[in-house]
Amino acid sequence: MKNVLDTIKRVKEMGLWLEVVTLVVPGFNDTSEELWETARFLASVSPEIPWHVTAFHSDYKMSDTDDTPASTLLRAAEIGREAGLHYVYAGNLPGRVDEYETTFCPKCNTALVKRTGYRIHKVTVTPQGTCPQCGSAIAGVWSAFQAPDITGSPASNP
């Protein structure tokens, strides 16, 4: 684990974009103590590191372990926010993890990217990577970002 933590620190020090995903597995790493430890570590490196907590599904070779309930992901996400992380997401349980599918401005709490699962419904971050409401810089790689076509219209075939 030390190598993983050192790599997270190095990647951030190098100025590269980094997001961390934690697969929360019941009985393995789902205690509040373990989640707090992870969240505090990430916040100590940078509160702008996005942390995705995702649910385990008992498939394939680990079918004897329970699926991660939405309540556990919500608890993990709340711990992340309380630890000081600005961008915390609870993933892979679409529609069951409340506001933890949405990106909010850490300064004014404006909803910036609204999602359900992996589907983006609305993006309001400016092309310069700022909040349209308060002008705060939003962590991310926005220079290459193009807002998706979320109108539902089919793409044209040239």
Cite the ranges covered by each PLM segment.
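Short, non-ligating residues that shape and space the ligands of small metal-coordination modules
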Residues: K114-R115, G140-V141
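Short cysteine-rich clusters marking metal-coordination/redox-active sites
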Residues: C105-C108, C131-C134
